[in-house]
C-alpha cells in the first residue's frame, strides 16, 4: 500500500511546530513515548462494547485486562471506589453524568462560562444547555474568586438537581467541602469536573474532590499527562436517590446508572487503544518522579504569574494555586484584544489562547484576556529561570503586536531556546 505522504508530511510539520515553540496553552501537554506507543497499537483493531467480563463481542479477553488495569490504577491514584475509563473525552464524561442524573429540562448549576466555566457545564450552544436548564454562579468582581455565598443563594432559590464545580480558566483552589454542604442543603448531586488540576490533585498538591463530591469527572490529558480522553469516578458508590430499579426490582446503584449512561447511553464501542494508553499514563502517575513534575508545574506557574505581575500585567485573582493563570490585558494594554494578543504571540511561536475574563466587556470572539499554563513547558524540562524569560518575551511581543521585525526576533529567540529542551524530559 502506498504511504500517505500528504498526511505524514503534515504530521511532521506539527511535530516541528511543537519542538520549536513554547507551548503555554493550559489544557495542553506532551505524552511520553510509551503512552504514544500504546495509542498507536493493534488494540485499535478491537471492538469491545460493554465492560470487562461483560462484552457484546467475543475475543475481548486481552483488552479486558488492559481496561481493568486502567480502572484499578485510576482508583488507586484518587482513592475512588468506582471508576469508568471509557469516555472518549471530558465533555463525553460530563454528558454521561448529565444523562445518569438529570431528565430533559431538569435544572442544574455551574460556573458562569464568562467567569471561567466550561461549555459542557451549561453553555446554551452545548447539549448541557440545550437539553437541560442551566443556572449559574459567578466569581466575586473584587477578588476574582468563586463567590460561594452567591452559589448558596442561587442554589436555595433555584433548587438545582445537580451542582457542578470546576472550570476551564480558574486558577484557584476550590472549596469542595463548602460545595458539598450547599448541595446537601438543597438535595442536589455534587459533580466536580477536575479536568484542569487533576494531575496536581493526583500528586497530592491540591485537595482531592473525590473525598467530597458524589461524582467526579476528568480528562486524562491536560495536567494528568495522558492521552486525550475522559474518566468518571466516585469516592463511594451509593443507591440512586430516585428509586430507579433493576428488572428484578432492586434499587440500582449509582455506578450502574453511570455505566449505562456511558454505554449504551452516549457511546458505542470503547477506544481500547486509548484506554491502554490511559493505563500507561496512570502508571506514570504512581511513580515518585511524577510528584516532582507536578511540583515543578505549580512552581513554574507561580513564578510566571508573579513575573507578569512585576511587569504590570493583571492576573485574575492576583495569582495562581494550580498550573494556570488568566491574564486581563485591559490594565496594561487597554485597546489590545485577546484575539490580537494570541495571534501576535503565536507568530512568535509562543502558543496561548484568547479567553474572556470575568465581567468582560468584549465578546468571546475578541476577549480581553489570554489564558496561560505551565504543564507542557514543564514536561519539556523548563524551570523557574525560563519562566522569567517567557514573561519578558510575552511583554516584548504584546508591546509590539504590529512590529513584524520585533516578533521575528522573539521567534528566533524562542526557537533557539527550545533547542535545549526535549519534548519529554521526564
From Swiss-Prot:
GO terms for molecular function: glycine hydroxymethyltransferase activity; pyridoxal phosphate binding. Its cofactor is pyridoxal 5'-phosphate. (6S)-5,6,7,8-tetrahydrofolate binds at residues 113, 117-119, 363-365. It comes from the Bacteria. Pathway: One-carbon metabolism; tetrahydrofolate interconversion; Amino-acid biosynthesis; glycine biosynthesis; glycine from L-serine: step 1/1. Keywords: Amino-acid biosynthesis, Cytoplasm, One-carbon metabolism, Pyridoxal phosphate, Transferase. CDD domains: SHMT. It is an enzyme of class 2 (transferase). Pfam families: SHMT. Catalyzes the reversible interconversion of serine and glycine with tetrahydrofolate (THF) serving as the one-carbon carrier. This reaction serves as the major source of one-carbon groups required for the biosynthesis of purines, thymidylate, methionine, and other important biomolecules. Also exhibits THF-independent aldolase activity toward beta-hydroxyamino acids, producing glycine and aldehydes, via a retro-aldol mechanism. This is Serine hydroxymethyltransferase. It comes from Bacteroides fragilis (strain ATCC 25285 / DSM 2151 / CCUG 4856 / JCM 11019 / LMG 10263 / NCTC 9343 / Onslow / VPI 2553 / EN-2).
Amino acid at each position: 500500500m502506498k504511504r500517505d505522504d500528504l498526511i505524514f508530511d503534515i504530521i511532521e510539520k506539527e511535530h516541528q511546530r511543537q519542538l520549536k515553540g513554547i507551548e503555554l496553552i493550559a489544557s495542553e501537554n506532551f505524552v511520553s513515548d510509551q503512552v504514544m506507543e500504546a495509542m498507536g497499537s493493534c488494540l485499535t483493531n478491537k471492538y469491545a462494547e460493554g465492560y470487562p467480563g461483560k462484552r457484546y463481542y467475543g475475543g475481548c479477553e486481552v483488552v479486558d485486562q488492559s481496561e481493568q488495569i486502567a480502572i484499578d490504577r485510576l482508583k488507586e491514584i484518587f482513592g475512588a471506589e468506582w471508576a469508568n475509563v471509557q469516555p472518549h473525552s471530558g465533555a463525553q464524561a460530563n454528558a454521561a453524568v448529565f444523562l445518569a442524573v438529570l431528565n430533559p429540562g431538569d435544572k442544574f448549576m455551574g460556573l458562569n462560562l464568562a467567569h471561567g466555566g466550561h461549555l459542557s457545564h451549561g453553555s446554551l450552544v452545548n447539549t448541557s444547555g440545550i437539553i437541560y436548564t442551566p443556572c449559574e454562579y459567578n466569581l466575586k468582581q473584587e477578588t476574582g474568586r468563586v463567590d460561594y455565598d452567591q452559589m448558596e443563594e442561587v442554589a436555595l432559590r433555584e433548587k438545582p438537581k445537580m451542582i457542578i464545580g470546576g472550570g476551564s480558566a480558574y486558577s484557584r483552589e476550590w472549596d469542595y467541602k463548602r460545595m458539598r454542604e450547599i448541595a446537601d442543603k438543597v438535595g442536589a448531586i455534587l459533580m466536580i469536573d477536575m479536568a484542569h488540576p487533576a494531575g496536581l490533585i493526583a500528586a497530592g498538591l491540591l485537595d482531592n474532590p473525590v473525598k467530597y463530591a458524589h461524582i467526579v469527572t476528568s480528562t486524562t490529558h491536560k495536567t494528568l499527562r495522558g492521552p486525550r480522553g475522559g474518566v468518571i469516578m466516585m469516592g463511594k458508590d451509593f443507591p440512586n436517590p430516585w428509586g430507579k430499579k433493576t428488572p428484578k426490582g432492586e434499587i440500582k446503584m449509582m455506578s450502574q446508572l453511570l455505566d449505562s449512561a456511558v454505554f449504551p447511553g452516549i457511546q458505542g464501542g470503547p477506544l481500547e487503544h486509548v484506554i491502554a494508553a490511559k493505563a500507561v499514563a496512570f502508571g506514570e502517575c504512581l511513580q515518585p518522579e511524577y510528584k516532582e513534575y507536578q511540583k515543578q508545574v505549580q512552581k513554574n506557574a507561580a513564578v510566571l504569574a508573579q513575573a507578569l505581575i512585576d511587569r504590570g500585567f493583571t492576573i485574575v485573582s492576583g495569582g495562581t494555586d494550580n498550573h494556570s493563570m488568566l491574564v486581563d490585558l485591559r490594565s496594561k494594554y487597554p485597546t489590545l484584544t485577546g484575539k490580537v494578543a494570541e495571534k501576535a504571540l503565536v507568530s512568535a511561536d509562543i502558543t496561548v489562547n484568547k479567553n474572556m475574563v470575568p465581567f468582560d466587556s468584549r465578546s468571546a470572539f475578541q476577549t480581553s484576556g489570554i489564558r496561560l499554563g505551565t504543564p507542557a513547558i514543564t514536561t519539556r524540562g523548563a524551570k523557574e529561570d525560563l519562566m522569567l524569560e517567557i514573561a519578558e518575551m510575552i511583554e516584548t511581543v504584546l508591546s509590539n503586536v504590529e512590529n513584524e521585525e520585533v516578533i521575528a526576533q522573539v521567534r528566533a529567540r524562542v526557537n533557539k531556546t527550545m533547542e535545549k529542551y526535549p519534548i519529554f524530559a521526564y
